[in-house]
Amino acid sequence: MSTPNTHLLCLIATDLRKHFFAVLVGMLIVCSAIYNVYTTHKTRGLVTQIERLAQDKDDLMMEWRNLLIEEHTLDEHSRIRRIALKKLSMSQATKKNSVLVELR
């Protein structure tokens, strides 16, 4: 005596053997779709990472330019001080050679 479950399993197995190529193509399509979703997800993550790195690069370039400006500014002050010391024989004021002028 065969049970309905056994009969159903036999029918499914027969159909799978009979339409093996169609089942295989269907499974490949599903796998391809899942891989497509995975690839799209990874691509979006990489694009986000590239944009973040580009922003970091821009921030670092701006900081570099600001540091160069600061370096040139500080260098200009030391250049003026050096010229004042050598060519004009100027020196830093001390308490002895400073004069306090009071306003009345």
From Swiss-Prot:
Cell compartment(s), UniProt: Cell inner membrane
Organism: Psychromonas ingrahamii (strain DSM 17664 / CCUG 51855 / 37)
Membrane topology value: Single-pass type II membrane protein
Keyword Flavoprotein: no
UniProt record similarity statement: Belongs to the FtsL family.
Leader sequence segment: none
Topological domains annotated Cytoplasmic: 1-19
Pfam families assigned: FtsL (PF04999)
GO biological process terms on file: FtsZ-dependent cytokinesis
Keyword Cell division found: yes
Ranges per topology, Periplasmic: 40-104
Name by which UniProt lists this protein: Cell division protein FtsL
The gene coding this protein: ftsL
Domain of life: Bacteria
InterPro entries the record matches: Cell_div_FtsL
Keywords recorded for this protein, A-Z: Cell cycle, Cell division, Cell inner membrane, Cell membrane, Membrane, Transmembrane, Transmembrane helix
HAMAP family: FtsL
Subunit and interaction comment: Part of a complex composed of FtsB, FtsL and FtsQ.
Task of the protein: Essential cell division protein. May link together the upstream cell division proteins, which are predominantly cytoplasmic, with the downstream cell division proteins, which are predominantly periplasmic.
